[in-house]
Amino acid sequence: MKLLVASNNAKKLGELQRILDQAGIENVELLALADVPSYPEPVEDGRTFTENALIKARAGASNTGLITLADDSGLEVDALNGMPGVLSARWAGKHGNDQANNDLLLAQIADIPEEHRGAAFVSVCAIVTPDGREFVEEGRWHGTLLREPVGTNGFGYDPLFVPMEESLIEGRDRSSAQLTAQEKDALSHRGKALRALVPAIAELAGQ
C-alpha cells in the first residue's frame, strides 16, 4: 500500500516509518509530496489543528488518488492563552522560520516566571482515503518553556521545550531538541497521534 504523507519534512516521514516498524506493519510505502506530481497547495485556513490536518489530507487524496496522511501541529502556551496554536509555524510572519518564531516567543514570555511557563505541543494527524473515509487522532505533550534555546536534534520550538517527563527526573532538564529520535518518538505529541492511527493504517493495508 502506498501512503502519501502530505509533507516534505524527512524527519516526519522517518518518525512514521519507525512507528510502523515498531508496530510490525509491513508493505506500506511512504511517499512524500516530492514523490508525486505537484498539485495546488491547499490554503490552511482552519481555526483548529483538526481542520487544517483534514484540509491537507483531503487535498492529497483528491489530487493524487492516494491514501493521504497529514498532520497539523503547534505549540499552545499557557501564558499566551493557547497561542501561537495553529499559527505556530508562521508566528513571526514567515512560514517555517524557526529562529524568528523562537525569538519572538521568548520575547513575549520574557517576564513570565518559571511556575507559569507551562505549554503543550499538540498534533492532530488525519488520514483520508480517495473514497472519502477519514481517520483523525490527536496527541498532546505537556512541558515548560526555557529562557533560551538548548539542543540541536529537533526543529520548530523543540529547543525551548522541556517535556514534563524530563522535569520529573531530578537533575534532568533536557529540551526536546536534546532527546534522541527514539526518545522523542515515545513521548511526543506527533508520536502519540501517529501511534493512535496505527490500527487504521493496518486496516487499510489489509493487515
Swiss-Prot record:
In the record's cofactor note, how is the cofactor described as bound?
Binds 1 Mg(2+) ion per subunit.
The protein's required cofactors: Mg(2+)
* E.C. designation(s): 3.6.1.66
- Output the GO biological process annotations, alphabetical, semicolon-separated: nucleotide metabolic process; purine nucleoside triphosphate catabolic process
Q: Which InterPro entries match?
A: dITP/XTP_pyrophosphatase, ITPase-like_fam, RdgB/HAM1
Ligand binding (Mg(2+)): D72
Which family does the similarity line name? Belongs to the HAM1 NTPase family.
Instruction: Identify the enzyme class.
Output: hydrolase
The entry describes its oligomerization and partners as:
Homodimer.
Q: Does the keyword Hydrolase apply?
A: yes
Protein name as annotated: dITP/XTP pyrophosphatase
Identify the SUPFAM superfamilies for this entry: ITPase-like
Q: Name one GO molecular function term.
A: dITP diphosphatase activity
